[in-house]
C-alpha cells in the first residue's frame, strides 16, 4: 500500500500539537462548578444532558461521588445508564446543611472526577467561591442539582456553565 509523505508530516504535526495541548492543560486549572436547575416533573431532561458527560468522566481512574438527600441510586440504573458501577460512590441521607461542606472536602481531594450534590436553596457567593476553589484544587467538576416545581423559576444564577436548551422552554 502506498502512503504519501504528507501523511507522515501530518502525523508528526498532530503528535507535536497533542504535546503542546497536554503541556498547556497541565498549566491551567480545569475545575468547574455548575448549578443545574431542573423541573421535578421532567427529570429525564437532566439525565439526557448530564449522562454523556458522566459517562465520559467514568473513563477516568477517579471516582464519581453522589451526595443524595433521600433516594438511593439503584445498581440497575447505574449500569443501564452506562456509568461504571465500580467507580460510583454514594452517600445518601445527607443533611442539606452538610452537603456544601462535604462537596468542598471531596472536590479538594482530587480523588473524584465529579461530585454531585442536591440542594434546595441557592448558594451564597461565599459557598460558590469555596466550591470553585476546591474544584480547581482537585481538578474536578461539581454539580449542584436543584429541583424546582413546574410553576416556579429562579431569580438569579451565579456564574458558571449555563446550558440553554429549547427542551426546557
UniProtKB/Swiss-Prot annotation:
Q: How is it modified after translation?
A: Is rapidly cleaved and degraded by the Lon protease once DNA damage is repaired.
Task: Give the span(s) annotated as FtsZ binding.
Answer: 106-112
Tell me which NCBIfam families the record gives.
Answer: PRK10595.1, SOS_SulA_coli
- Could you identify this protein by its name? Cell division inhibitor SulA
**Gene3D superfamilies under this entry?**
P-loop containing nucleotide triphosphate hydrolases
Per the UniProt entry, the disulfide pairs are none
**Family from the record:** Belongs to the SulA family.
Which is an annotated Pfam family here? SulA
One GO BP: negative regulation of cell division
Its domain of life?
Bacteria
Q: Which residues form a coiled coil?
A: none
* Site features described as Essential for degradation by Lon protease, chain residue numbers: 169
* Record's keyword annotation contains Cell division: yes
Q: What induces or represses this gene? A: By DNA damage, as part of the SOS response.
Q: Which UniProt keywords are given for this protein, alphabetically ordered?
A: Cell cycle, Cell division, DNA damage, Septation, SOS response
Q: Where is the segment annotated Lon protease binding?
A: 162-169
Subunit comment:
Interacts with FtsZ.
Amino acid at each position: 500500500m502506498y502512503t504519501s509523505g504528507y501523511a507522515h508530516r501530518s502525523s508528526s504535526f498532530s503528535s507535536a500539537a497533542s504535546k503542546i495541548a497536554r503541556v498547556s492543560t497541565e498549566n491551567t486549572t480545569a475545575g468547574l462548578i455548575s448549578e443545574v436547575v431542573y423541573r421535578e416533573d421532567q427529570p429525564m431532561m437532566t439525565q439526557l444532558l448530564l449522562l454523556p458527560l458522566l459517562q465520559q468522566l467514568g473513563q477516568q481512574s477517579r471516582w464519581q461521588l453522589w451526595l443524595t438527600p433521600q433516594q438511593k441510586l439503584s445498581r440497575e440504573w447505574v449500569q443501564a445508564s452506562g456509568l461504571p458501577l465500580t467507580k460510583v460512590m454514594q452517600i445518601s441521607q445527607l443533611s442539606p446543611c452538610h452537603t456544601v461542606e462535604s462537596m468542598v472536602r471531596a472536590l479538594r481531594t482530587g480523588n473524584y472526577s465529579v461530585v454531585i450534590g442536591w440542594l434546595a436553596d441557592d448558594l451564597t457567593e461565599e459557598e460558590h467561591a469555596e466550591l470553585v476553589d476546591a474544584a480547581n484544587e482537585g481538578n474536578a467538576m461539581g454539580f449542584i442539582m436543584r429541583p424546582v416545581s413546574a410553576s416556579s423559576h429562579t431569580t438569579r444564577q451565579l456564574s458558571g456553565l449555563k446550558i440553554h436548551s429549547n427542551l426546557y422552554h
